[in-house]
Amino acid sequence: MKPQLLLSLLLAALLPMTASAQSGEGEFPDLFNTSAAYDMLAVFPQADKLAEDPFFTGTLGADTLFLDRAHRIDSVVRPSQLCNLYSLSGGSKDDPEQVVEFFASFDPESLPQKVRGAWIDEICSVRDELSYCLQRLAQAGYAQYWQEQVRPCLNNAIEQYRIAPEQLGAIHQEITRLAGGQPLDATGSRIYILGNIDNAFALLDETFCCTPLLLDPETARQYRIDFMQVYIHENLHRLSLSGELLDMLQTLYDNDDFYRTHEDRARAYGEGGNEAFVVAAERYVSRRLGPVSYTHLRAHET
């Protein structure tokens, strides 16, 4: 099957979708946010660098057990998994102490059946390590460190990036059209800019986390990707795909070498499933909207 036909089949199935939340559009008042809680959960890939920071001299820097357990956590789970689990707790996004309490006491059996799976089992397999490391981070003053050294950098990146509300509205209108007229909830378009990640990922509460690198115009030009592309992509993840579409994706996987090759590549990075469809839909929406770039959006500054 030719790639063009594959894309056509995927996009032909766009209409059997429903928006996860449907309370209307709005003005996107709280688009960018920061979160000490999510940054704390995303710290494990950066544990060595953190321990070398002068702020943690004599605490994390001298705790080999912390580093050993942080490395173990990083080898088993990703920041997106930890942040997704915490997003289900209803806990504060700004209080690291609540993160410590949640991971010390959460019961996997209390989670909704629809979110259980191998990813929860992976988190549970390093539960003791998580509890120890999160407690040590809190005791070492991670909340103060984040307020003094991380948050100012994130706020600076946010303040320098400008988005025209009409541009966001146009994106939501296109996604609403694909969803059969059922709009996304604009209040769900909340993005947490985190200092400890270099990518972006959606959360189960319909928000998503994003690296500040994507707010930087130089990075956007160098890698030909910017925040608005990620915004379209992650908002498409908020849609529920129909069983008909999922069956079609499986049929493509079973019968099409092109699709199977790229799906296997996505699965190797912990993605897969509906990811190929979301990428196809992202390109479709982007083409309908025309070029979306940092320079274009800056023209809308007031």
Model-derived regions: residue spans:
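N-terminal mature-domain "stem" immediately C-terminal to a signal peptide or N-terminal signal-anchor/transmembrane
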Residues: Q22-F102
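Active-site scaffold of zinc-dependent metalloenzymes
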Residues: I197-I225
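Conserved small/polar residues in nucleotide/adenosyl-binding loops
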Residues: T295-T302
